[in-house]
Each structure stands twice: as C-alpha cells, then as structure tokens.
C-alpha cells in the first residue's frame, strides 16, 4: 500500500505473511522492517550481489522476456531469487 502526495511517492507499507514481516517507509523517516531501521545494501560488486527477477505470467505473450540476459547475469552473481512478488523483491533490496 502506498500514498502519493502531489505525484510523489511519500509513504508505503508491504506485509509479508509468509515471514510475518512488515516493511514501512516514509519520506524523511527512512525505512523499517518490523520497526527495525533498514537501508539499501552497500554491496558494490556484482559477484557479491543477489539477482532478483520475475518473468511474465505467460511466456508466450512476448518474445522479449530477457531470458538470455538473465542467464548471463546468473553466472556473475552470488545467487538468484524469484519470489513471485515484485513488491517483496523491492523490499528485500535493503
């Protein structure tokens, strides 16, 4: 759930029922997971990074599904995660 004020994303919350975690963020207040402050990872090298992605529900809908790029990057990173939820993928960037 999010709130935009004058076209600017200002407040947001994401709940992960599987892990019972609540992510919240607001402009000027930072972000939290279960009230603990979180921040974006400081990892700078691709080989130490976790690749998070998703694919279209119906792979036959489009021929440009970035599969070749995904395969290439898979071998350059620490690992791959496909959660099925874009909002959770973004929350776990921190």
Roles of regions detected by a PLM:
Residues 1-32:
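DPxDG-like acidic metal-binding loop motif
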Residues 39-94:
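An extended, acidic
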Residues 31-34, 53:
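Short hydrophobic/aromatic-rich beta-strand segments that constitute the beta-sheet cores
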Residues 9, 37-39:
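Short, solvent-exposed loop/turn motifs
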Residues 23, 36, 49:
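A broad, low-specificity signal marking well-ordered, structured residues that form hydrophobic/aromatic
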């Amino acid at each position: 759930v999010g709130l935009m004020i004058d076209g600017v994303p200002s407040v947001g919350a994401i709940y992960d029922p599987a892990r019972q975690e609540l992510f919240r963020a607001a402009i000027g207040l930072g972000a939290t997971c279960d009230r603990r402050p979180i921040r974006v990872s400081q990892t700078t090298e691709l080989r130490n990074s976790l690749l998070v992605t998703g694919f279209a529900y119906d792979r036959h809908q489009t021929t440009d599904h970035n599969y070749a790029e995904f395969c290439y990057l898979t071998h350059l990173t620490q690992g791959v995660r496909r959660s099925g939820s874009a909002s959770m993928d973004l929350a776990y960037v921190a």
